[in-house]
C-alpha cells in the first residue's frame, strides 16, 4: 500500500504481521489481494470498519449502504443491488459537502465489491471520520485509535487460512 507499510512489514511472517498489525486499512488491502475470491467476506468486514463512524453519518443513504453491505456479505442481495446502494451513497456525498468523508466511506464500502482499492479507502475514510469527530483536538490519536479498532475488526471477521 505504501512505503510505511512495507517498512513496517520488514521480514515478518504473514501470521505475525496479521496478529500484530494496528492498521485496518493495510489489513484490508492485504486481504483483498491474497483472498480475492472472498469478496463477500471482505465487503462485510469493510462495512463493519466503516460502521465505526456511522454515528457521524447524517444522510440516510450512507446508513442504508452499510446495511446493504451487510446483506451482500450474508448473500441476501446481489452485487448489482449493492452497487445501486453505492450510487445513492455517492450522490449523498456529492450533495452534502459537509458530510463528504462519512458518505464517501459508506460508498467505498459498497464499492469494495468490485474494486479492491475501495476496501482500503473505506477504512482510511472511517479513520478520517474519527479525526473530524475529534474536532482536530487530537487528530493523530483519534486516527490511530480508529485504525487499531478496524485492525481488530479485520482479525475478528477475516479468516486468513
Question: What is the predicted function of each stretch?
Answer:
Residues 1-161:
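Short, glycine-biased loop/turn motifs at secondary-structure junctions and
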Amino acid at each position: 500500500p505504501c512505503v510505511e507499510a512495507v517498512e513496517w512489514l520488514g521480514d515478518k511472517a504473514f501470521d505475525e504481521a496479521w496478529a500484530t498489525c494496528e492498521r485496518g486499512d493495510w489489513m484490508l488491502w492485504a486481504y483483498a489481494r491474497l483472498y480475492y475470491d472472498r469478496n463477500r467476506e471482505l465487503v462485510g468486514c469493510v462495512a463493519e470498519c466503516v460502521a465505526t463512524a456511522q454515528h457521524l453519518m447524517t444522510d440516510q443513504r450512507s446508513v442504508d449502504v452499510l446495511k446493504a453491505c451487510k446483506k451482500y456479505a450474508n448473500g441476501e442481495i446481489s452485487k448489482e443491488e449493492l452497487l445501486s446502494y453505492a450510487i445513492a451513497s455517492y450522490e449523498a456525498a456529492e450533495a452534502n459537502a459537509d458530510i463528504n468523508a462519512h458518505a464517501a466511506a459508506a460508498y467505498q464500502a459498497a464499492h469494495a465489491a468490485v474494486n479492491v482499492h475501495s476496501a482500503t479507502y473505506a477504512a482510511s475514510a472511517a479513520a478520517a471520520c474519527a479525526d473530524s469527530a475529534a474536532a482536530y483536538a487530537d487528530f493523530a490519536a483519534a486516527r490511530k485509535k480508529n485504525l487499531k479498532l478496524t485492525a481488530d475488526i479485520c482479525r475478528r471477521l477475516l479468516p486468513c487460512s
